[in-house]
Amino acid sequence: MTQTARVKLTSTSLPKLDGVCGEIMGIGKKTGVKVKGPTPLPVKRLHVATRKSPCGNGTETYEKWEMKMHRRIININADDKAIRQLMRLKIPDDVYIELSLT
């Protein structure tokens, strides 16, 4: 019986995220299972504005910092062999993966 595995990927580095997506798609092609995705989700943007002057005097000038969180979803009709290969996948430190079976 095949199960559907939903893989959620999150990263601040878009090239590393796309690399992991490509590896997962390659596993799907090798094992011959049906793969849907990668579906891009909206980018989360975290903004932080800080005053440049540490003492509080002078003109109000601000530095603006932004961090983008890129997300992807891949659905795989996975059998045991495909799931084992997903578990062995080498994932970079700044790519977070969440795997749920339904």
Curated annotation (Swiss-Prot):
Gene3D superfamilies reported for this sequence: Ribosomal protein S10 domain
Any single Gene Ontology cellular-component annotation: cytosolic small ribosomal subunit
Domain of life: Archaea
Pfam families: Ribosomal_S10
InterPro entries, per the entry: Ribosomal_uS10, Ribosomal_uS10_dom, Ribosomal_uS10_dom_sf, Ribosomal_uS10_euk/arc
Keyword hit for Ribonucleoprotein: yes
SMART domains: Ribosomal_S10
Keywords annotated in UniProt: Ribonucleoprotein, Ribosomal protein
Ribosomal protein keyword on record: yes
Cystine connections: none
Record's function text: Involved in the binding of tRNA to the ribosomes.
Family note: Belongs to the universal ribosomal protein uS10 family.
Assembly with partners or alone: Part of the 30S ribosomal subunit.
Entry-linked PANTHER family: 30S RIBOSOMAL PROTEIN S10 FAMILY MEMBER (PTHR11700)
Name of the molecule in the record: Small ribosomal subunit protein uS10
Species the sequence originates in: Nitrosopumilus maritimus (strain SCM1)
